[in-house]
């Protein structure tokens, strides 16, 4: 599976009054190190990007930054935020600027995406949300931006039931949690961690009732 990119843009940096370096900070928790980025949508614009201006897959954070510079936009923060198939198409829900290019995927299958419950991260105006897929269906949202990934890390304050404290799969991981209706928190581990420890960070240290896994070995920030 390939990755696509989720981006925070400063469309009017001076009037927003938030410097790019203020978005993210290091955090240590239970012998692991993380980079944590808090994004308040009342102050910062959050968007999803897949293709460049010519309709070609971006493929890298460098290509993304270059594409945005060509449009006169400044990149404040970027993180890969989902999974693609070999044809570079998202395997789950993908909405960009209100246009749904891929419908919600509720099928069973193999791989992290299909470890249910998986979930959806979405943006609507200055609101942000993280919800398990079946819960998202009931919300009947019409988001501006959305990406489906999996598995969920934390569901309504509980760590995903399939995670084990003694899990032996250790990788660099990244994901997103919801702090409140306007604030998302994005995290990437600086060292390899298992799913349980990553989920515990969101639940216990960052106090996120819902959090979603984005990517493993190829995580980038």
What is the meaning of each model-derived region?
Residues 2-10:
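Sec-dependent signal peptide recognition
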Residues 8, 86, 101, 160-161:
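A broad, structure-centric signal for solvent-exposed, well-ordered loop/edge residues
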Residues 3, 61-65, 121, 128:
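Generic hydrophobic, helix-prone segments enriched in Leu/Val/Ile
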Residues 3, 14, 209-210:
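Short, intrinsically disordered/low-complexity patches at protein termini
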Residues 10-18:
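Hydrophobic h-region of N-terminal signal peptides that target proteins for export
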Residues 17-112:
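Zymogen propeptides
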Residues 74, 104-221:
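Active-site beta-strand/loop microenvironment that shapes enzyme catalytic pockets
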């Amino acid at each position: 599976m390939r990755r696509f990119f989720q981006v925070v843009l400063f469309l009017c940096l001076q009037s927003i009054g938030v410097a790019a370096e203020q978005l993210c900070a290091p955090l240590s928790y239970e012998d692991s190190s993380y980079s944590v980025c808090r994004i308040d949508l009342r102050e910062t614009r959050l968007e999803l990007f897949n293709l460049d201006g010519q309709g070609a897959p971006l493929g890298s954070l460098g290509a993304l930054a270059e594409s945005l510079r060509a449009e006169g936009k400044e990149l404040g923060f970027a993180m890969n935020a989902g999974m693609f198939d070999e044809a570079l198409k998202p395997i789950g829900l993908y909405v960009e600027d209100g246009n749904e290019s891929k419908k919600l995927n509720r099928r069973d299958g193999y791989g992290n995406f299909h470890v249910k419950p998986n979930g959806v991260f979405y943006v609507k105006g200055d609101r942000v949300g993280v919800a398990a897929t079946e819960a998202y269906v009931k919300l009947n949202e019409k988001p501006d931006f959305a990406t489906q990934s999996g598995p969920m890390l934390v569901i309504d304050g509980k760590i995903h039931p399939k995670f084990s404290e003694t899990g032996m799969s250790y990788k660099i991981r990244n994901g997103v949690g919801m702090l409140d209706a306007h604030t998302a928190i994005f995290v990437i581990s600086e060292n390899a961690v298992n799913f349980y420890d990553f989920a515990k960070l969101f639940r216990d240290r960052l106090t996120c009732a819902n959090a979603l896994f984005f990517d493993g070995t190829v995580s980038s920030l």
